[in-house]
Amino acid sequence: AQGGLDNVSLRQINNAAGQRNSSAAHYHFGSKEALIKAIHEYRGGRINERRHTRLARLSTQEREQVRPLIEALVYPIVAEIEETEGGGNFIMFLSQLYSNPALDLMSMWRSHLSESVGAVYQQLRGVLPEIPEEVAGMRFGLMWVAMINTLADRQRLMVTRPGETAVARALPVLFVSNLIDMLCGAAAAPLSA
């Protein structure tokens, strides 16, 4: 994740994994794209599960508010970053996936994350019926990419410039709360046109 998806070979991945067999990753996955899909599936499945659990725990009142729904979008990914080995690398990896036109991202998205993210979106649509469907869809897509890239940028800064920027110095709770505030504002902003 740190050097970029396009700049790493399966041989380098084997070496980083401590594999003496230089073709182990190719043997197990067949290609770099298949390895990328496997990583996405592994991490995405856990995030999906966390998000479904969080949504199921929302009260009726919370299901009618923007913030608890946005929290259900954000916190499962934050948990993956903070609570799992390699979670910080995963968010940087995910950010790179979204900017790589060579990958079939939509098939990965549909199979591993879209179910729980779609549930959040549908509940937000119920809370914000005044936002037209087309606008709501665009906003949600922009919010998703902004969330992924913001979390990835913070992780990069924490690795490359710890303590040097306000983002890297911010306590995780403050940073995530601020991100959620921004996403809530984006979701519920009145139409200007």
Enumerate the language-model features and the residues they cover.
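C-terminal peripheral helix-coil segments that are non-catalytic and often amphipathic
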Residues: 114-193
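Short alpha-helical scaffolding segments that buttress acidic/His motifs in well-ordered protein cores
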Residues: 73, 77, 91-98, 143-147, ...
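Hydrophobic/aromatic residues within well-ordered alpha-helical segments
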Residues: 32, 39, 43, 47, ...
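Hydrophobic alpha-helical connector segments
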Residues: 52-90, 140
